Amino acid sequence: MDKMLATSVYDEKLKSWIVYVDSEGLLLPVGRTINEDLGLFEYCKFNTKEEAIDWINSKPNIKYDKDLIVR
């Protein structure tokens, strides 16, 4: 199985680093659903870029790619 590619981006509004994973050409933020009925989603936030990259590297099926661009 190929590894999914991921990158980290600083979000000014959230004041945190967010991880995005490439899923079939779409860059999706990492997080979790906190209320499915209301469609509420919470981002997985990191204090530093290094923490975000360490999280990516700790996952066996995800690989960090600094060249992915989140728009």
Can you annotate each of these PLM segments?
Residues 1-34, 67-70:
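Short N-terminal "domain-start" leader segments
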Residues 32-64:
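A short, charged, amphipathic alpha-helix used as a generic interaction element across diverse proteins
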